Amino acid sequence: MKISRRTFTQNMAGSLLTFSLLKSLDKVDALANTVSPIVRKWLIEMEHLTQQLRQGQIKSTEWQSQIESLLSRVDLKDLLTAIDFDKLSKTAVFPEDHESAEDVDFSQNKGLPGELSFAPYFYAMKKGTAIVPHGHRNMASMHMMLKGRSHCWQFERVSDEAQYLTIRPTEDKELGVGAVTTVSDHRTNIHWFRALSEPVFMFNIGVFRINPSEAFNGRDCIDPLGGEKLKDGLIRARRIEIKEAYALYGKS
């Protein structure tokens, strides 16, 4: 069973306390009638790749590489038009200790199914706020910088314990406009972003519950800076709730 954007929004809202990121689809009117043929082709390719991922025809690491390649070929102006960037940027909300996210509706584009296999979002952040350190299970996602600068940290998820995750740092870099990052269960599972300018806008897609027979629970938040340093650069990081993650990492 494919989890819908609306179901994911409801689940996240319940499990992440006051995680007021995701708003109703009827508040965003970013429809496909403004999408150019190039971007429409890109959207169709993205949907095809995600269907292949869900059907087990490609691995999650292949999905990551191909999504990154697709985005590198899309003209930024076309992408901004496709998501109705002007409207979304004007109505964006900027919480004090985390990002905000608006749903982007591509469902009326020609050549696409009524319900996509991935969920697209528009993220907004004020300077100093963060997408707190977290990982996922049974999910893949992509973030693309649309405006501003952010710092990105990524980690491999080495092992799980009830109260800890052992992780290996893989990326520690600044991102500018056009930069793309991806995560999955099998490559760079954990990520963390901090806005270096204001505003920061990102395009995001999430592929939730890739394997319908396995659990999906949103975000696994951790405390990497307070973690135990192990040999070979590994960190044993404590699992934390979203409220504590916001307190520790949400604002700097």
Name each model-derived stretch.
Residues 1-16:
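N-terminal secretory signal peptides and thylakoid transit peptides that target proteins
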Residues 22-61:
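C-terminal segment of N-terminal export signals and the immediately downstream linker at the start
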Residues 99-127:
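A short glycine-rich, His/Asp/Glu-containing loop-to-beta-strand
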Residues 121-136, 185-188:
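Conserved short histidine dyad/triad with adjacent acidic residue
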Residues 139-140, 144-151:
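Glycine- and acidic-residue-biased ligand/ion/polar-headgroup-sensing regions
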Residues 142-144, 197-210:
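A short hydrophobic beta-strand segment most commonly corresponding to one strand
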Residues 159, 163-188:
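Short acidic-glycine-tyrosine-enriched beta hairpin
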Residues 192-195:
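Asparagine-centered strand-capping/turn motif at beta-strand->loop junctions
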